[in-house]
């Protein structure tokens, strides 16, 4: 912008006199107005989100959150097999504790939700997230070291102890005169687990002397225990307690052991390229007013029609 300084004014007065000086001042004024009009083609916007110069500020949205918002829906991978009270079909609608949790996350993101139930195993749920075919994996997923190499895990939303259900006759032969604790810790029998589940890995780690046999589903594992095909089955305490609640007479042929020093932490799987989504999910979990525990899960099972 052109400026008229005091020295310029004095010099012009000495050289030109009053009338020429007035003409010069008028020229400077017109020039200044013209420059101002040229430099301010856009009006100054004043609102709550402006920079120091009054320019509107646009807050960038991280790529992982932007992807979900642009799509308009959160895609959640969930196991194809119903697992009440976590997720199951009721009157044609998917419901359950984990379904409610997934809907809460979508609600906070202000998008719709779509459940993808193509996965036939827990590991396939993890794979779908790792391959970016789903934003989240919510399916009673345990955190394991191999899984943590291909996905992020949220903070746990439920912690359960590990547990065994044992065939009484087969276990008695195995235990002989040993103490129960010693026999369990040095378990040398056969142990049934669900194939492609976290407990396949847990069994090999915590019971290295056992012969681990994989079955396609939990019912097949329980059949093997009841028939004496395996000495015991290995899973979390909820599944073992559910077994006894559904069939109280099972205590006549089966015995259970809860492993208090081994925990199964259930978490949400998130893609490794989605760090902001991970932080967001953790924040949603931390703000949940009603934290889950084994008692609430068992009560929810009781309420299921």
Regions found by a protein language model. Name each.
Residues 123-124, 140-149, 205, 219, ...:
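A ligand-binding cleft/hinge motif common to bilobed small-molecule-binding domains
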Residues 44-140, 149, 214:
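Extracytoplasmic small-molecule ligand-binding "clamshell" domains
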Residues 19-30:
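Bacterial N-terminal signal peptides
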Residues 80-81, 158-165, 171, 237-286, ...:
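Periplasmic-binding protein-like
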Residues 81-83, 94-108, 163-217, 237-239, ...:
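Bilobed "Venus flytrap"/periplasmic-binding protein-like clamshell domains
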Residues 103, 107, 112-184, 254-261:
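Acidic, polar ligand-binding/catalytic clefts
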Residues 42-58, 194-207, 254, 284-305:
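Ligand-binding clefts/hinges and TM-proximal coupling segments of bilobed small-molecule sensing domains
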Residues 1-12:
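N-terminal secretory signal peptides that target proteins for export/translocation
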């Amino acid at each position: 912008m052109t400026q008229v300084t005091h020295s310029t004014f004095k010099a012009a007065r000495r050289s030109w006199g009053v009338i020429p000086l007035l003409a010069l001042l008028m020229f400077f004024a017109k020039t200044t107005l013209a420059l101002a009009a040229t430099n301010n083609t856009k009006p100054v916007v004043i609102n709550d989100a402006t920079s120091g110069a009054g320019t509107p500020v646009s807050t960038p949205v991280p790529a992982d959150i932007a992807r979900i918002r642009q799509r308009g829906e959160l895609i959640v991978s969930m196991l194809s097999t119903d697992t009440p009270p976590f997720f199951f079909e009721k009157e044609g609608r998917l419901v359950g504790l984990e379904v409610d949790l997934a809907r809460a996350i979508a609600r906070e993101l202000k998008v719709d939700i779509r459940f993808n139930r193509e996965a036939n195993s827990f590991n396939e749920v993890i794979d779908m997230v790792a391959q970016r075919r789903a934003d989240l994996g919510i399916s009673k997923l345990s955190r394991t070291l191999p899984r943590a190499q291909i996905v992020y895990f949220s903070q746990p939303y439920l912690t359960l102890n590990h547990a065994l259900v044992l065939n009484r006759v087969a276990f008695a032969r195995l235990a002989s005169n040993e103490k129960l604790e010693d026999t369990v810790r040095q378990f040398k029998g056969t142990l049934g687990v669900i194939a492609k589940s976290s407990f396949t890995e847990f069994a090999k780690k915590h019971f290295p002397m056992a012969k681990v046999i994989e079955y396609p589903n939990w019912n097949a594992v329980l059949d093997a225990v009841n028939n004496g095909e395996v000495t015991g089955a290995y899973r979390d305490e909820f599944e073992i307690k559910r077994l006894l609640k559904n069939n109280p007479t099972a205590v006549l042929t089966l015995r259970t052991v809860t492993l208090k020093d081994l925990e199964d932490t259930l978490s949400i799987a998130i893609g490794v390229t989605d760090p902001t989504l991970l932080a967001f999910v953790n924040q949603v979990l931390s703000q949940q007013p009603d934290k889950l525990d084994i008692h609430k899960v068992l009560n929810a099972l009781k309420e299921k029609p």
